[in-house]
């Protein structure tokens, strides 16, 4: 075997970008040739406990586009991305040995599955005498800069935010994207391409809020368009609860989830916007949302696997139903509640749903149907193009009333929310064509239509559109009693 000069390896994970990438920056500083690797882990394409695809078609295609874009970006700066498939804790050390890597640089993750991979990887590298250096790069605030330890993290977001603001935490500056990299060593490696079944074909629905394209390039373009070309940041707080169209919110979440956009870079651009355009409630609110994302990540660090347990962070032993029939009505958007149905159909057909929609459909599953909240969390995991393990499971804990900030029984009044956030029924008609003829004052509660009105508007309940699967207020009150008494109805 010919002598291979020493090199370093950068292992890309949920950090598919060149900007603000500390592992890449440290590798560059080493002065050695860099090999960049992305490894598709087949476990991420397996099934959830409920038998859903762990990574559904919307997210898998967005991931594939993001990896491809990273490869193109690395090529432009003189390097290349090695793409392979297998268990990273086995595959990465094998590659590292073959290229004579002295050090592996990577970003650290938070939850159990990812941490297990890291630990086993480091174990294998130690046997081979290869150094592993992990860095933190997924949040706005670095955990080392927090005014408390992770174990002392406040259980309420408001206290978390106020403590950070009070201590005037400095956000660390971004690392520059490299303009040139040394080429990776020219060594023939046996790489396993991901199988086509990882990336099922998807059909783009023209009703989608945005034609989401994976990758750093598309993420930066979206930021440029939303902040600078469209000048929409100044109105973010007023429009963020919308549900129709590309620009009611930033829509950065898919790129944040895969690390195509760095939260620190977004923060940096918000601060520039405040200097060059305007500083107002909207600019502050976008930073506020980035802090929510941080909070859920730190909560996951603090509580570990409790996040995924039936009893949640508080280990509350609430009884939950396992009603497959009603779950299927919820999942497919056939509950008879237009706001729930429209949002679930949007999710299924596009991989996206507004934040307002997520809160309402989750509340309906937990507080009206009383179905195991983990079923909903798993369906979101499978479908969402912007799935983020910490935010998803943290939000479901919150909605189910088992999160670390659980207070009195809380639920979303679906009919009222529908009228408040979609007064003319524009969003409902967008996704429920069977209700398109109903006027704005009738569309939110079609179950109240008389036989004459059904005929007048061309909607026959139970035929064209389902009758409600539960009585809204009765089901909420029944659930309230169950949670107060802790017994199954």
From Swiss-Prot:
Pfam families in alphabetical order: DNA_photolyase, FAD_binding_7
Membrane-spanning regions, if any?
none
Q: Which organism is it from?
A: Synechocystis sp. (strain ATCC 27184 / PCC 6803 / Kazusa)
Gene Ontology biological process terms in this record: photoreactive repair
GO molecular-function term, one example from the UniProt record: DNA photolyase activity
Please give the function described in this protein's UniProt entry. Answer: May have a photoreceptor function. Binds DNA; represses transcription of at least 8 genes, including slr0364 and slr1866. Does not encode a DNA photolyase function. Its disruption does not affect circadian rhythm.
Kindly state which keywords UniProt assigns to this record, in alphabetical order.
Chromophore, DNA-binding, FAD, Flavoprotein, Repressor, Transcription, Transcription regulation
Q: Cite the SUPFAM superfamilies for this sequence.
A: Cryptochrome/photolyase FAD-binding domain, Cryptochrome/photolyase, N-terminal domain
User: Where does the UniProt annotation place the signal sequence?
Assistant: none
Stretches assigned to the Photolyase/cryptochrome alpha/beta domain: 6-140
Please give the NCBIfam families that the UniProt record associates with this protein.
crypto_DASH (TIGR02765)
Stored InterPro entries? Cry_DASH, Crypto/Photolyase_FAD-like_sf, Crypto/Photolyase_N_sf, Cryptochr/Photolyase_FAD-bd, Cryptochrome/DNA_photolyase_1, DNA_photolyase_1_CS_C, DNA_photolyase_N, Rossmann-like_a/b/a_fold
Q: Which classification does the entry list for the species?
A: Bacteria, Bacillati, Cyanobacteriota, Cyanophyceae, Synechococcales
Cofactors named for this entry: FAD; (6R)-5,10-methylene-5,6,7,8-tetrahydrofolate
Q: Give the protein's recorded name.
A: Cryptochrome DASH
Question: Could you confirm whether the keyword Cytoplasm appears in this record?
Answer: no
The cofactor remark states: Binds 1 FAD per subunit.
